[in-house]
Structures are given as C-alpha cells and as structure tokens.
Amino acid sequence: MKFFLLFLVVLPIMGVLGKKNGYAVDSKGKAPECFLSNYCNNECTKVHYADKGYCCLLSCYCFGLNDDKKVLEISDTTKKYCDFTIIN
C-alpha cells in the first residue's frame, strides 16, 4: 500500500520534470537558423512552446520542450556546450 501511495506522488512529478532541451525542428526536419538570441527565444516559446530559447552555434536551441516535440540529433559534446552556455 505504501508503494502504491509513493507511486501516486512520484508519477506527477516525473511528468513535470520530463521536459527536454535541443534544437527544435519544423515539419521539414530543419532547425531555425539565427544570429540573435531574442529571435530564438520568440521562436522557441511561441512556435515550439518551450520555456525559453537562445542562439547556439547559429541555430535556435530550446529549453523545456515537451517530450512529443522532435529535436535535431546532435552530438553529446554540442548538447553539453549549449546546455552549459545558457547557465553561465
């Protein structure tokens, strides 16, 4: 019974924390190109419904995308670089 109650408490939290980061792609499989972070923030939040976005390596990198959104496959090094850059 305790396990079941714990499961009911943890399940909604996992849904909230289940967001991902990456280059969101359109229907053609292309990530938006950019030079300015403000453009990417608008693109990510209004078009892809992410929490925020910025320009990383000339493409819009979005934070807080829903799990059902498609993202561009990138190397772990690029992902770590873009994740690290926004923190600092």
From Swiss-Prot:
Coiled coil: none annotated. InterPro entries: LCN-type_CS_alpha_beta_dom (IPR044062), Scorpion_toxin-like (IPR003614), Scorpion_toxin-like_sf (IPR036574), Scorpion_toxinL/defensin (IPR002061). The keyword Endoplasmic reticulum does not apply. Expressed by the venom gland. Residues 20-83 form the LCN-type CS-alpha/beta domain. Has the structural arrangement of an alpha-helix connected to antiparallel beta-sheets by disulfide bonds (CS-alpha/beta). This is Beta-insect excitatory toxin LqhIT1b. It comes from Leiurus hebraeus.
